[in-house]
Amino acid sequence: MMSRKSVIQRNLKRISICDRLKSKREKLRAIIKDQSISMNDRFLAQVKLSKLPRDSSYIRIRNRCLITGRPRGCYRKFKVSRIVLRQLGSIGQIPGLTKSSW
């Protein structure tokens, strides 16, 4: 069973926003952590960081299967769920993946 298309699209939108604002977020975070910068400047950086969209944080991205959109049991290396991995592996669609036997 596939996830709703809106849920998959929402996650893809979060990925694109995160990629777009990653450098800005990292710079602000570095300013906040730097003790040599004045407290006022660090506070302003904290305010700017909090005004960035919530979805620009990588924490909000869910690791989903590319084929079914399944949120759990998803292998990062192949970007598919365990169920799809087994199906594709059994018909030889994933290079280098062989059925184990001993």
UniProtKB/Swiss-Prot annotation:
<comment type="function">
    <text>Binds 16S rRNA, required for the assembly of 30S particles and may also be responsible for determining the conformation of the 16S rRNA at the A site.</text>
</comment>
<keyword id="KW-0689">Ribosomal protein</keyword>
<dbReference type="GO" id="GO:0003735">
    <property type="term" value="F:structural constituent of ribosome"/>
</dbReference>
<dbReference type="GO" id="GO:0006412">
    <property type="term" value="P:translation"/>
</dbReference>
<dbReference type="GO" id="GO:0005737">
    <property type="term" value="C:cytoplasm"/>
</dbReference>
<comment type="similarity">
    <text>Belongs to the universal ribosomal protein uS14 family.</text>
</comment>
<keyword id="KW-0687">Ribonucleoprotein</keyword>
<keyword id="KW-0699">rRNA-binding</keyword>
<dbReference type="InterPro" id="IPR023036">
    <property type="entry name" value="Ribosomal_uS14_bac/plastid"/>
</dbReference>
<dbReference type="Pfam" id="PF00253">
    <property type="entry name" value="Ribosomal_S14"/>
</dbReference>
<comment type="subunit">
    <text>Part of the 30S ribosomal subunit. Contacts proteins S3 and S10.</text>
</comment>
<protein>
    <recommendedName>
        <fullName>Small ribosomal subunit protein uS14</fullName>
    </recommendedName>
</protein>
<dbReference type="GO" id="GO:0019843">
    <property type="term" value="F:rRNA binding"/>
</dbReference>
<dbReference type="InterPro" id="IPR018271">
    <property type="entry name" value="Ribosomal_uS14_CS"/>
</dbReference>
<keyword id="KW-0694">RNA-binding</keyword>
<dbReference type="InterPro" id="IPR001209">
    <property type="entry name" value="Ribosomal_uS14"/>
</dbReference>
<dbReference type="GO" id="GO:0015935">
    <property type="term" value="C:small ribosomal subunit"/>
</dbReference>
